């Protein structure tokens, strides 16, 4: 067996297990590059639209972005956006958009849609403005927008994007992008909702580290009555691939 990657299926989940974080970053970057190249080629041969790619925040994708920065990717054919964001100034140290820009997109040449933060603008208003930007930028059909690729992560509590356990955002069905309060005293979050994630052509979830192992095991082999938010990504039509390192997969009882 190739020790860099183990490819298995667990129920509806397509799972790719990499030996360590470096192998995960390399493998994820290769998959993302291949996907973007194919979709940009198809788009240019069809209507010339930009390929819509949601970028993940958090710490796990940083190494993947470093790999992507060295690869031959037709970024001029891409419109990137943030799958979720803290509602903070665009240069704030906690901003996902700032991290994504520094790590990759500031020098890549892609169109990059950032959340329209303003000190006097409520988070709900910013979410509505950003949703309008996304709708104008991506393809779709009569049922709604169709993002091409969504990159996401997963927290130790099983959240993905800014869809947290117990959050009202889990039940939103009439918005593609929404504002949600995670905890009192913390910045509001803006996030893609399940209706938008379920419309994607593909979703890649990157998970790294032993601290994520219990949540990943519960997501992929649930034992409780209430599925963790990350599992609900698989309730739609979008194919979801779980790209994980062996430490995160420790609870899956792999051979």
Show where each model-derived region lies.
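Class I SAM-dependent methyltransferase SAM-binding "motif I" and its flanking Rossmann-like core
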Residues: 150-195
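Glycine-rich beta-strand-to-loop/alpha-helix junction loops that act as flexible
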Residues: 55-60, 152-156, 208
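ATP/nucleoside-binding phosphotransfer catalytic cores, i.e., glycine-rich phosphate-binding loops
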Residues: 2, 201-255
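Short, conserved loop/helix-junction motifs that constitute active-site signature segments
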Residues: 71-79, 106, 169-170, 195-200, ...
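A short secondary-structure junction signal
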Residues: 125, 160-166, 215-219, 254
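Ligand-binding beta-strand-loop-alpha-helix segment within the catalytic cores
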Residues: 2-12, 76-151
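A glycine- and small-aliphatic-rich helix-loop capping segment at beta-alpha/alpha-beta transitions
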Residues: 66-75, 98-102, 165-174
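N-terminal glycine-/serine-/threonine-rich phosphate-binding loop
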Residues: 1-53
